[in-house]
Amino acid sequence: VSVSAADKSMIGAYSGAAALKKQGAANSSKFGGTLAGAVAYNGVKTGVTAQIKDAAITDAQSITNLATREGAVVAAGLALGVDTATTGGATSLNAGVSASVNEINSGTHAVMNNVTTNNAKGKTAVNNIAQSKDIQVAGGITAQYAKGGGIGIGAAVSSLHAANDIQSRITNSDLHDIGTLKAYAQTDLVQVGTVLSAGVIQGHTGN
């Protein structure tokens, strides 16, 4: 007897923003700038349940009840600002902001409830297993480049909030003639939260 439930979904929220400004030498502006902002948000609730319920199982060599979650949830934001002002007297403000948020509520359950086993021919191997192998990522990147009299400001924020509920349960059951019994919940999660902000300012020439 074999029952399995699997969730292998790939869920992503991606955002990007870019700002570009170019000034020639004849530009008399005393102030210029670029602003780029990007926000990526995931609000995810997932659940997978493998269940054997209200069953009488006779003479089974093995009973396997397996719940598996094996996917990825990604939030990524990218902000890019480029200012190529070449005017001699201008001041350039170049700003980039990136925010990435992952809010994850995940459940992986293997449940045997009100199950009766008998085996007149030998012993039964019972496996009740819940396992989660998710990849959960929140990442933000900003990059700023200003040419001329410039100021570069960059901010990258990432937030990863994950509630992973992994359960293996055998309840209200009467198991007879059992050779081996394996009931466990296993997690092998990869969780990454990363930010990167970079800015390059080149001095202006002229008066």
Residue ranges of model-derived segments:
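Low-complexity, glycine- and small/polar-enriched segments
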Residues: 1-207
